[in-house]
A protein has these predicted regions:
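Amphipathic alpha-helical packing segments from all-alpha helical-bundle domains
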Residues: 106, 110-124, 135-164, 173-180
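Solvent-exposed, amphipathic alpha-helical segments
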Residues: 30-37, 80-91, 125, 181
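Hydrophobic alpha-helical connector segments
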Residues: 72, 86-118
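Alpha-helical DNA-contacting segments of helix-turn-helix folds
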Residues: 71-80
């Protein structure tokens, strides 16, 4: 099955659920397949449980809503990505100002590598966040990271000015466009 979201194409094998899994794990696997195929907004709890030969009652024994299920699938992964990005920003900001220009690429490079490595280790969950989360709080991951980066950029501009190396002022719209493009 080929699933197309935005400009990304993902290949998803037909969903076959291991019957040896617990009911909860079966729900998670079926939900991942449904969300990857249809996105959060168009995914159906009925389809998820029907694909397992279960009832909605079985589902509601574990979760109160589709939103709660999606949170269970991606919440920890979303939090890891945001926390890792914030940690890199803090590591950089905590350096002596004189060192910052010399190591900026090092810290951000390690952060991006770590985040990409994590995303590949948790590929389906990260695809859910980045491509299938419209209608959830997770759909704002890139926007949240852009805002963190904008704040970091402004702090770094102040450091450069303090070091006698001021950077030219940035138009806020252009700054937002450039930083957003960096994440896409």
């Amino acid at each position: 099955i080929v699933v197309i979201y935005s400009t990304a194409i993902f290949f998803k094998e037909a969903c076959t659920i291991d019957e040896n899994l617990t009911t909860l794990d079966q729900i998670h696997e079926a939900a991942k397949a449904e969300f990857l195929q249809k996105g959060y907004k168009d995914a159906s709890l009925r389809n998820i449980v029907k694909s397992l030969g279960k009832t909605l009652g079985a589902f509601y024994g574990y979760y109160k809503s589709k939103e709660e299920l999606f949170e269970a699938l991606v919440g920890e992964h979303y939090q890891y990505l945001i926390d890792r990005f914030k940690d890199a920003q803090k590591q950089f900001a905590d350096l002596p100002h004189e060192q910052q220009p010399e190591v900026m690429g090092d810290i951000s490079g390690v952060c991006m590598f770590d985040m990409l490595h994590y995303a590949y280790q948790h590929l389906e969950e990260c695809k859910l966040i980045l491509c299938c989360s419209e209608g959830t709080r997770f759909s704002g991951l890139i926007d949240e990271m852009v805002e963190i980066e904008v704040e970091g950029t402004h702090a770094y501009q102040r450091v450069l000015a303090e070091l006698g190396r001021p950077s030219p002022p940035l138009d806020p719209t252009m700054e937002h466009i450039l930083i957003t493009a960096m994440f896409h």
